[in-house]
C-alpha cells in the first residue's frame, strides 16, 4: 500500500489527482483512443473496499478480488467464489410440516397480524410433555394440555415474576387455580380488555378470529381446567422446578436489571432514548397544545354531560306530563262515576304559557313583510307599526328572546312566564334616551350662550386703545365701515362685553353693557340702509333694537361667467333676491334726473325692474340661523378650521393695524405739508375755476367717466389705508355706466367743488386730531358718500380686496339713499375679481 | 482456485514465515514438544484442511463422546469456515505456537500474530490518514474527491484500538446493526438449522436461547421464523400457525419474487426472529439493540405453501449517514442465484423512489463487497454503454443509479475505467468492459421492475422514531 502511494505521488506531476463529481467527463471507448499513454495511467493500487481490515486480507476474498481485477485488465481468469458452508441438503420431512394450502391473492398482500396472533396457543408441547400425556388417564387432548400449561406459565409470570430466585415457593395448585379463575373472570368482566371487546365483536358480528379466545372459550377453558388442571399441575411443577423457575419454553435472554454487556446471548436491548436536543420553545408549544387539547376535551365532555342532563330532564318532564294526563283521566272517570258536575278546567291541559310566545311570533311575522320592502302605508295597524318600529330599531333581523333556535326545542313549560321585550324596543328606547340627552345638552348650551356672540367669523382685531379712545371721547358718531374692524369698533362701543383691552372702557361702558340687550337676531341686512339714507347704526338709540344691528356676513353669492350667443359675455349670479326695497320714488329720484317731465309709465317701471333685477347682491332673507342658535357653529365650518382661520386673521390684522397706524402718522405729516401747498393752490385755482375743463388731469382717471369720489379718494391719498379697502371697493362696485347717465358736466363741477370742501374739512379734522383713527377716515369717506356721487373704479381699490367681506359689504352699506347698483357686464373684470375674493 | 492459492501462499506455513520476516519484532516461539492434551484455547497448530496443511487457532476444546475435539479458526480464512475437528487432524509434528504471554488470560481475544502485525502497521497507517487529512482540505468539500484516497465510511477504525464503550455508544446513537466481531462469541453455537425444506449449516454465532445450542439441529419455521429445539414442539407449532407470508405489506411482486415491507416496531417478534436467523450468516451483525428503528424488506418466493423467505435487507428508518441498507443477506440455500443482486437492485430502487442516493452500511462482508462491486460495475457499465452518451459527470451517474458518488468513483477505479487522457480525466470503456457488457447482455439477469413497486417512502414522526418503551 505504501508502494502504491509512492507510485501515485511520483506520477502526480503528470496528472490531476483530484476530480470533481460535477466535472464533465468524456466517455470514450478504448478502441477509439489508441494513443492513450499507459505510463501516465495510475498504477493499480489498493482501493478501500469497505471491508474490515482484518478480513480484507482473507485468502478467499483476495483471490476473488484479484480475479476480478485480472478480468478487468483483460486477463482470462476463472471466476472465483468464496467457499461457504454447506446449505444444499434438503429436509425430507418438509411436506409433513408444511401443508399446501396457500392461495396467492390477486392484489398485493397487506396485513398487520403478528406472529403471536397467528400462532394459536403459545405453548408448544415437546417430547417430554408427549410422554407425560401418554401416561395420563383419562387421556387429555394436546390442545387442552397446551392451553392449561400456557395458563400456568402466564399466571406464574404475573404472580411470581421472581420465582426463579427460590423455586420452592411455587404457587400451589389451589392458589394457582384461584388466580386463573380470577384472571378469566376479570378479563370477561373488564369492558376495556381486548378479549372482552373481541368477544363482543365476535358475538355481535358472528365472526371468529383464528387463535383467539372469546368469552365462551374462557368459560369452556374454565370447565376444562377444573377437569384436568389438577392432573397437569404436578407435571408442570416438576418441569418448572427442573427449569429452576425459568419458563419451560426457552426464550431469548433479554437485558437483566444489572447490565451485562459481555454476555453474547443477551440481545435486543432496549435502546436508550436518543438524546433529542430540546429547546424550551418546543416544550412550551407542545405544553400549550396539550393544554388546549385538554381544555377542548373538557368542553366536549361537559357538552355531552349537559346534553345527557337535558335529556334526562326532558324524560322526567315527559314522565310528569304523562302522569298528569293519567291522573286527569282518572279524575275524569271518577267525576263521571261520582256524577260531579263542575268546571272542567282542571281537566284541560293549560297552555297558557304557550300563548305569549305565539303572540310575539305573530308580531315578528307581521314585521317581516314590512321589512321586506313594502310601503309604510301598509303598516296602518298599530301592531304592524309597532313591529315596524321594532324592526327599524333593531336594524338587523330582530331576534326576540322568545325566538328559539330551530334545532333546540324548548318545551313550552320551560319558557318563563313574563313580559318579554323585543330587542328592537330596547334599542329604540336607548336611542331615544341618547337623543333626548343630546337635545337637553344643546338647549342648556344655547341658554348659557344666549348673551354671547360668536364673532370669530368676522375676526376680532385687537387694536390700540388710543385710536379708539379718541372716537369714544369725541362723541362723534362712528362711521361704520362695515368691515369686521368696524364691527369690532361698534361692539366695543356698545357692548363692552366684547372688549377687554382697557379698564377705562370697561368702566365707561359698564352701564350700557348692563342695559344692553343681546342681539340675537341681527341677521337683517336690509335694515342697514334706511330709507332716508341715514345709517341706522349711527343712532345710538338704535343699538337697543336688535333688528337694526348689522352683522355683516359673507354674501352667499356665487357667480358664473359664460359666453352667450354672438360672443356675448354673461355673468350669472346666484343667491340674489329680487330687490323688494326698490321703490318707484327712489327710482324716480335716481333715474329721472334727465327726464323729469315724463311720468313713470309701466314700461319704464318694467325696464327699471328688469334692470334692477340683479341689483341686490345679498340675500336679505338669508337666515343666519346657525349664528344665533348655536354659536359654536359658524358657516358650517368646522371648529378646527375656524380656529386656524381666526388665529391667522388675528395675527395678520394686528400687524396690518400696527403698520397702518405707523403709515398714517407719516402720511399725516406729509399731508400737513401738502395742505399748506394746496391752500395756496386753491386760491390760485379759484381765480381760474370758471375756465377749468371737467376732466381734471389731477384726478388720474379716464376723463369721460368723470371720476369723482374715486378721484377724490386717490387724490386725498387715501386718508386711512386701512379703511381704504372697503371704500375703494365701493367705488369698484359702482358701475361706470351710471356716470354718464346720472351726471352732467355741470354737476360734475359742483361735485368736485363739494369734494374739495369735503377734503378741506377732512384735512382740518385730521389736523385737529393727530391720532387718526380708522373711524375718522371712515367718517370722511362716509361724508363723501353721503353726497350723491358716481365713482369710478379706483385702481388702488383692488389692493385691499383681501379683506374679508369688504367688497360685498361695500355695496350694502353705502350711505346713499339710492341703492348702489351693479350693472351686469358693466365691469366684468372687477366683479369677477370680487367673486374670487368672496369665494 | 489453484491459481489463487499459488498467488497467495500466505496462509500456508511457508507464507507465514515470510510474514514474520516482514515483522521481525514478535518472535514466534514454536514449541515442538507438546502433547495433544496440553493444547488449550489460543494455541496455533497445524491442521490438515481439505488435503492441505493450514495454521489454525484453537478457539475451544471439548470432549465429545469421549473424543477430544477442537474448534478451530483457520488463519486467513473467513470465520464461516471455522470448524470442529477431531484431535487426529492436528499435526503436532510441526510444533505449536503458544499464545502471547502478555495476554494469557484472554483466550477469546484476537489471534496473537494478527494483532502484532496490526500493531506494526498502525503507525504508518495513521500517519497516512493524518497526512491526507492535512494535505487534502478538498476532501471536506462535497464534490471534490481525492482519487488517491477515497475514504469509505466505517472502515477507518483500527480494530486494535477498538474501544468497547465507544463501540456501544456508537451503536446506541447511530442505530447501526453491525458490530465489531471482536466483541461477540467467536464460536459458532448451532450445528444445523432446518429452515423450510433446507438443512443449513450456520456460519456464525447467533444468540438463540442457549438451551437450543445443545441440540443437533434446530427447526425454524419458514414463515414465522420461530425456532424450536424439539421436533415435537415444531410439529405442534406448525399445526397451529396460520401465517403464510412475512407479516407486512407486499410492496413488490413480479413473476418470480415478492417484497414485503415490515416495520420492526410493529412486528417485533418476527423481526427479532429474522435477525437471529440472519445473524447465523452475518458476522458483523449485532443484535445488541432491538429492531425498532429498522424497516425490513424481505424478498420471498411463492409456491403453493406460501411465501418463502429468500433474503432481506434492513434499513434504518432515518439514517444519519445516508445508508440505504443496514444489513443485507441472501439465505445460503439461495446464494449464487442472482438473488443478492436483486436485493441490491431493490434497495437502490427504493432509494430512487425516495429521490436519494444511498450506500450500504460499512463494514461490508467479503461476500457483500463482491456482490456490491459486481452490481455497481454492471449498473455503471450498462448505463454508459446503453445510453451511448459522449460525456457525463460522476454526479449524473450517481443520480441515475441512486449510488453515491464515492461508490461510482470507487467502481470506475476498480475497473480501471478512469483514465487521464490529453490532460483531462475521461471515462474509458476498456475492451474488457465492453466484453463484460457483451456477456451481461447474454445473461439477461433479473431486475427490479420499478413499475411493479407500489411503495411510498414511509414517513415517521419524531415520536415514532424514539426507541424507548
From Swiss-Prot, chain A:
KW DNA damage (keyword) present = yes
Bias kind Gly residues: ranges: 697-713
| Top-level taxon of the source organism | Eukaryota
Q: Enumerate composition-biased segments (Polar residues).
A: 621-640, 714-730
Q: Does the keyword DNA damage apply?
A: yes
**UniProt entry keywords in alphabetical sequence:** Cell cycle, DNA damage, DNA repair, Nucleus, Transcription, Transcription regulation
One matching Pfam family is EPL1
Gene Ontology biological-process entries? DNA repair; regulation of transcription by RNA polymerase II
- Which cysteines bridge via disulfide bonds? none
- For the region Disordered, give the residue spans: 350-379, 393-415, 608-640, 679-839
Write out the biased-composition intervals (Low complexity): 679-690, 747-786
An annotated GO cellular component of this protein is: piccolo histone acetyltransferase complex
Give the Basic and acidic residues compositional bias ranges.
608-620, 828-839
Q: Where in the cell is it found?
A: Nucleus
> Which family does the UniProt entry place this protein in?
Belongs to the enhancer of polycomb family.
State what this protein does. Component of the NuA4 histone acetyltransferase complex which is involved in transcriptional activation of selected genes principally by acetylation of nucleosomal histone H4 and H2A. The NuA4 complex is also involved in DNA repair. Involved in gene silencing by neighboring heterochromatin, blockage of the silencing spreading along the chromosome, and required for cell cycle progression through G2/M.
Q: How does it assemble?
A: Component of the NuA4 histone acetyltransferase complex.
Protein name per its UniProtKB record: Enhancer of polycomb-like protein 1
Source species taxonomy: Eukaryota, Fungi, Dikarya, Ascomycota, Saccharomycotina
Swiss-Prot record, chain B:
Which species does the entry assign this protein to? Yarrowia lipolytica (strain CLIB 122 / E 150)
Supply the EC number(s): 2.3.1.48, 2.3.1.-
Name listed for the protein in its UniProt record: Histone acetyltransferase ESA1
User: Which InterPro entries does the UniProt entry name for this protein?
Assistant: Acyl_CoA_acyltransferase (IPR016181), Chromo-like_dom_sf (IPR016197), HAT_MYST-type (IPR002717), MYST_HAT (IPR050603), Tudor-knot (IPR025995), WH-like_DNA-bd_sf (IPR036388), Zf-MYST (IPR040706)
Where does the record place the modification N6-acetyllysine? 285
**EC supergroup of this enzyme:** transferase
Q: Where is this site: Important for catalytic activity?
A: 327
Q: Which family does it belong to?
A: Belongs to the MYST (SAS/MOZ) family.
Amino acid at each position: 500500500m505504501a508502494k502504491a502511494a509512492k507510485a501515485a505521488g511520483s506520477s502526480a506531476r503528470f496528472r490531476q489527482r483530484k476530480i470533481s463529481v460535477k466535472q464533465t467527463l468524456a466517455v470514450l471507448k478504448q478502441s477509439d483512443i489508441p494513443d492513450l499513454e499507459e505510463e501516465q495511467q495510475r498504477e493499480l493500487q489498493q482501493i478501500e473496499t469497505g471491508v474490515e481490515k482484518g478480513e480484507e486480507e482473507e485468502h478467499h476474498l483476495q483471490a476473488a478480488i484479484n480475479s476480478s481485477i485480472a478480468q478487468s485488465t483483460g486477463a482470462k481468469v476463472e471466476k472465483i467464489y468464496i467457499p461457504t458452508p454447506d446449505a444444499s441438503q434438503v429436509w425430507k420431512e418438509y411436506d409433513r410440516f408444511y401443508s399446501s394450502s396457500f392461495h396467492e391473492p390477486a392484489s398485493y398482500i397487506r396485513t398487520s397480524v403478528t406472529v403471536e396472533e397467528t400462532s394459536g396457543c403459545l405453548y408448544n408441547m415437546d417430547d417430554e410433555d408427549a410422554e407425560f400425556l401418554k401416561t395420563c388417564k383419562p387421556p387429555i387432548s394436546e390442545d387442552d394440555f397446551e392451553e392449561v400449561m400456557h395458563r400456568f406459565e402466564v399466571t406464574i409470570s404475573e404472580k411470581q415474576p421472581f420465582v426463579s430466585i427460590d423455586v420452592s415457593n411455587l404457587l400451589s395448585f389451589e392458589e394457582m387455580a384461584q388466580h386463573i379463575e380470577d384472571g378469566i373472570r376479570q378479563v370477561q368482566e373488564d369492558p376495556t380488555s381486548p378479549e372482552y371487546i373481541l368477544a363482543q365483536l365476535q358475538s355481535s358480528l358472528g365472526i371468529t378470529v383464528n387463535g383467539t379466545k372469546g368469552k365462551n372459550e374462557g368459560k369452556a377453558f374454565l370447565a376444562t381446567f377444573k377437569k384436568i388442571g389438577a392432573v397437569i399441575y404436578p407435571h408442570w411443577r416438576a418441569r418448572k422446578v427442573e427449569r429452576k423457575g425459568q419458563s419451560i419454553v426457552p426464550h431469548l435472554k433479554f437485558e437483566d436489571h444489572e447490565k451485562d454487556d459481555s454476555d453474547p446471548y443477551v440481545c435486543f436491548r432496549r435502546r436508550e432514548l436518543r438524546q433529542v436536543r430540546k429547546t424550551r420553545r418546543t416544550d412550551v408549544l407542545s405544553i400549550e397544545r396539550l393544554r388546549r387539547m385538554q381544555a377542548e376535551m373538557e368542553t366536549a365532555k361537559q357538552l355531552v354531560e349537559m346534553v345527557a342532563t337535558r335529556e334526562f330532564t326532558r324524560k322526567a318532564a315527559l314522565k310528569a306530563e304523562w302522569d298528569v294526563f293519567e291522573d286527569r283521566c282518572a279524575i275524569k272517570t271518577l267525576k263521571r262515576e261520582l256524577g260531579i258536575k263542575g268546571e272542567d278546567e282542571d281537566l284541560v291541559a293549560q297552555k297558557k304559557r304557550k300563548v305569549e310566545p305565539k303572540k310575539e311570533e305573530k308580531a315578528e311575522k307581521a314585521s317581516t313583510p314590512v321589512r321586506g320592502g313594502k310601503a309604510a302605508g301598509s303598516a296602518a295597524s298599530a301592531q304592524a307599526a309597532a313591529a315596524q318600529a321594532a324592526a327599524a330599531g333593531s336594524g338587523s333581523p330582530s331576534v326576540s328572546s322568545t325566538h328559539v333556535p330551530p334545532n333546540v326545542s324548548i318545551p313550552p313549560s320551560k319558557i318563563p312566564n313574563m313580559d318579554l321585550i323585543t330587542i328592537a324596543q330596547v334599542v329604540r328606547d336607548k336611542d331615544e334616551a341618547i337623543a333626548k340627552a343630546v337635545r337637553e345638552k344643546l338647549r342648556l348650551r344655547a341658554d348659557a350662550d344666549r348673551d354671547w356672540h360668536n364673532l370669530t367669523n368676522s375676526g376680532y382685531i385687537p387694536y390700540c386703545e388710543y385710536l379708539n379712545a379718541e372716537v369714544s371721547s369725541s362723541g362723534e358718531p362712528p362711521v361704520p365701515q362695515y368691515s369686521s374692524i368696524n364691527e369690532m369698533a361698534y361692539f366695543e362701543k356698545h357692548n363692552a362685553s366684547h372688549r377687554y383691552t382697557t379698564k377705562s372702557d370697561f368702566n365707561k361702558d359698564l352701564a350700557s353693557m348692563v342695559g344692553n340687550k343681546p342681539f340675537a337676531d341681527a341677521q337683517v341686512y336690509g335694515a342697514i340702509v334706511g330709507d332716508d339714507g341715514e345709517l341706522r347704526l349711527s343712532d345710538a338709540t338704535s343699538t337697543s333694537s336688535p333688528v337694526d344691528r348689522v352683522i355683516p356676513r359673507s354674501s352667499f353669492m356665487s357667480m358664473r361667467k359664460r359666453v352667450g350667443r354672438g360672443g356675448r359675455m354673461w355673468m350669472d349670479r346666484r343667491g340674489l333676491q329680487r330687490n323688494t326695497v326698490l321703490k318707484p320714488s327712489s327710482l324716480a329720484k335716481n333715474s329721472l334726473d334727465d327726464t323729469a317731465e315724463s311720468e313713470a309709465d309701466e314700461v319704464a317701471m318694467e325696464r327699471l325692474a328688469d334692470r334692477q333685477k340683479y341689483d341686490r347682491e345679498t340675500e336679505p332673507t338669508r337666515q343666519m340661523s346657525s349664528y344665533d342658535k348655536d354659536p359654536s357653529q359658524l358657516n358650517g365650518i368646522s371648529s378646527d378650521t375656524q380656529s386656524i382661520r381666526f388665529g391667522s386673521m388675528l395675527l395678520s390684522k394686528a400687524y396690518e393695524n400696527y403698520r397702518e397706524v405707523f403709515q398714517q402718522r407719516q402720511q399725516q405729516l406729509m399731508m400737513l405739508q401738502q395742505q399748506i401747498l394746496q391752500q395756496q393752490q386753491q386760491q390760485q385755482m379759484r381765480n381760474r375755476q370758471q375756465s377749468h375743463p371737467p376732466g381734471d388731469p389731477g384726478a388720474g382717471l379716464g376723463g369721460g367717466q368723470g371720476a369723482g369720489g374715486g378721484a377724490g379718494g386717490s387724490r386725498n391719498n387715501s386718508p386711512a389705508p386701512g379703511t381704504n379697502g372697503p371704500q375703494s371697493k365701493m367705488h369698484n362696485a359702482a358701475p361706470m355706466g351710471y356716470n354718464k347717465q346720472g351726471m352732467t358736466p355741470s354737476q360734475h363741477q359742483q361735485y368736485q367743488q363739494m369734494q374739495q370742501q369735503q377734503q378741506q374739512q377732512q384735512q382740518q379734522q385730521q389736523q385737529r386730531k393727530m391720532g387718526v383713527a380708522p373711524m375718522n377716515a371712515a367718517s370722511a369717506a362716509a361724508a363723501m358718500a353721503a353726497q350723491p356721487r358716481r365713482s369710478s373704479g379706483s385702481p388702488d381699490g383692488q389692493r385691499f380686496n383681501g379683506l374679508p367681506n369688504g367688497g360685498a359689504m361695500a355695496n350694502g352699506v353705502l350711505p346713499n339713499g339710492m341703492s348702489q347698483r351693479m350693472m351686469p357686464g358693466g365691469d366684468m373684470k372687477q366683479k369677477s375679481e370680487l367673486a374670487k375674493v368672496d369665494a | 482456485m489453484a491459481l489463487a492459492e499459488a498467488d497467495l501462499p500466505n496462509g500456508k506455513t511457508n507464507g507465514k514465515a515470510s510474514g514474520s520476516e516482514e515483522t521481525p519484532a514478535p518472535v514466534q516461539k514454536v514449541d515442538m514438544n507438546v502433547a495433544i492434551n496440553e493444547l488449550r484455547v489460543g494455541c496455533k497448530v497445524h491442521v490438515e484442511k481439505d488435503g492441505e496443511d493450514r495454521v489454525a487457532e484453537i478457539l475451544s476444546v471439548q470432549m465429545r463422546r469421549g473424543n477430544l475435539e477442537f474448534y478451530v479458526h483457520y488463519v486467513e480464512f473467513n470465520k464461516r469456515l471455522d470448524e470442529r475437528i477431531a484431535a487426529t487432524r492436528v499435526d503436532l509434528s510441526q510444533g505449536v505456537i503458544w499464545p502471547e504471554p502478555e495476554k494469557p488470560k484472554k483466550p477469546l481475544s484476537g489471534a496473537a500474530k494478527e494483532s502484532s502485525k496490526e500493531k506494526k502497521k498502525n503507525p504508518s497507517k495513521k500517519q497516512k490518514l493524518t497526512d491526507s487529512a492535512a494535505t487534502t482540505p478538498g476532501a471536506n468539500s462535497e464534490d471534490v474527491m481525492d482519487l488517491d484516497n477515497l475514504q469509505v465510511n466505517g472502515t477507518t477504525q483500527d480494530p486494535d484500538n477498538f474501544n468497547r464503550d465507544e463501540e456501544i455508544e456508537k451503536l446506541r446513537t447511530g442505530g447501526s446493526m453491525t458490530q465489531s466481531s471482536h466483541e461477540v462469541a467467536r464460536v459458532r453455537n448451532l450445528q444445523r438449522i432446518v429452515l423450510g425444506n433446507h438443512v443449513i449449516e450456520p456460519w456464525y454465532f447467533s444468540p438463540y436461547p442457549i438451551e437450543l445450542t445443545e441440540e443437533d439441529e434446530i427447526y425454524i419455521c419458514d414463515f414465522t421464523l420461530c425456532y424450536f429445539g424439539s421436533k415435537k414442539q415444531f410439529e405442534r407449532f406448525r399445526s397451529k400457525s396460520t401465517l403464510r407470508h412475512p407479516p407486512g405489506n407486499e410492496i413488490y411482486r413480479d413473476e418470480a419474487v415478492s417484497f414485503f415491507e415490515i416495520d420492526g416496531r410493529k412486528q417485533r417478534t418476527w423481526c427479532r426472529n429474522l435477525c437471529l436467523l440472519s445473524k447465523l450468516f452475518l458476522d458483523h451483525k449485532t443484535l445488541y439493540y432491538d429492531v425498532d428503528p429498522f424497516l425490513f424488506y424481505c424478498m420471498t418466493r411463492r409456491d403453493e405453501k406460501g411465501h418463502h423467505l429468500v433474503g432481506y435487507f434492513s434499513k434504518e428508518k432515518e439514517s444519519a449517514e445516508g445508508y440505504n441498507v443496514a444489513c443485507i443477506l441472501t439465505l445460503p440455500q439461495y446464494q449464487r442465484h442472482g438473488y443478492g443482486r436483486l436485493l441490491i437492485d431493490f434497495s437502490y430502487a427504493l432509494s430512487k423512489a425516495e429521490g436519494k442516493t444511498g450506500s450500504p452500511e460499512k463494514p461490508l462482508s467479503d461476500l457483500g463487497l463482491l456482490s456490491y462491486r459486481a452490481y455497481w460495475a454492471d449498473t455503471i457499465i450498462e448505463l454508459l454503454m446503453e445510453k451511448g452518451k459522449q460525456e457525463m459527470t460522476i454526479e449524473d451517474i450517481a443520480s441515475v443509479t441512486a449510488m453515491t458518488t464515492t461508490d461510482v468513483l470507487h467502481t470506475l477505479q476498480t475497473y480501471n475505467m478512469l483514465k487521464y487522457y490529453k490532460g483531462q480525466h475521461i471515462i474509458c470503456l476498456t475492451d474488457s468492459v465492453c466484453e463484460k457488457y457483451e456477456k451481461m447482455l447474454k445473461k439477461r439477469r433479473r431486475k427490479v421492475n420499478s413499475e411493479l413497486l407500489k411503495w411510498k417512502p414511509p414517513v415517521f414522526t419524531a415520536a415514532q422514531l424514539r426507541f424507548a418503551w
